[in-house]
From Swiss-Prot:
Protein role: Together with the chaperonin GroEL, plays an essential role in assisting protein folding. The GroEL-GroES system forms a nano-cage that allows encapsulation of the non-native substrate proteins and provides a physical environment optimized to promote and accelerate protein folding. GroES binds to the apical surface of the GroEL ring, thereby capping the opening of the GroEL channel.
Protein name per Swiss-Prot or TrEMBL: Co-chaperonin GroES
The encoding gene: groES
MF-aspect GO terms: ATP binding; metal ion binding; protein folding chaperone; protein-folding chaperone binding; unfolded protein binding
Family: Belongs to the GroES chaperonin family.
Location within or outside the cell: Cytoplasm
Lineage: Bacteria, Bacillati, Bacillota, Bacilli, Lactobacillales
Alphabetic keyword roster: Chaperone, Cytoplasm
SMART domains on file: Cpn10
GO cellular component term of the entry, any: cytoplasm
Provenance organism: Latilactobacillus sakei subsp. sakei (strain 23K) (Lactobacillus sakei subsp. sakei)
UniProt cross-references to CDD domains, sorted A to Z: cpn10
Subunit structure: Heptamer of 7 subunits arranged in a ring. Interacts with the chaperonin GroEL.
Main location: cytoplasm
Length: 94
């Protein structure tokens, strides 16, 4: 499993539908980048100048919304993930 460092979070990107309700298939390069996913791993938090860790607001299994162009896409064991800084997460879906 991927283990993020510092204030980074690993998100399993939700697979968006590739076909519209009317049956039209959308080319992968025409689809917008998804902005929601499930948190699968969380780093220990950023380190302050005095050596204290700042805990993150998200935890594993949280459904989140993140900035459209945030993070780095990573493929690991055939699954697509996004590794981003916690500050790029906009909201937790409850």
């Amino acid at each position: 499993m991927l283990k993020p460092l510092e204030d980074r979070v690993v998100i399993a990107v939700k697979d968006e539908a590739e076909q519209t309700v009317g049956g039209i298939v959308i080319a992968s390069n025409a689809k917008q980048k998804p902005q929601t996913g499930k948190v699968v791993a969380v780093g220990a938090g950023a380190m302050t100048s005095d050596g204290q860790r700042i805990p993150l607001d998200v935890k594993e299994n949280d459904e989140v919304i993140y900035d459209k162009y945030a993070g780095s896409e990573v493929e690991y064991e055939g699954q697509q993930y996004l590794v981003l800084h916690a500050k790029d997460i906009i909201a937790i879906i409850e």
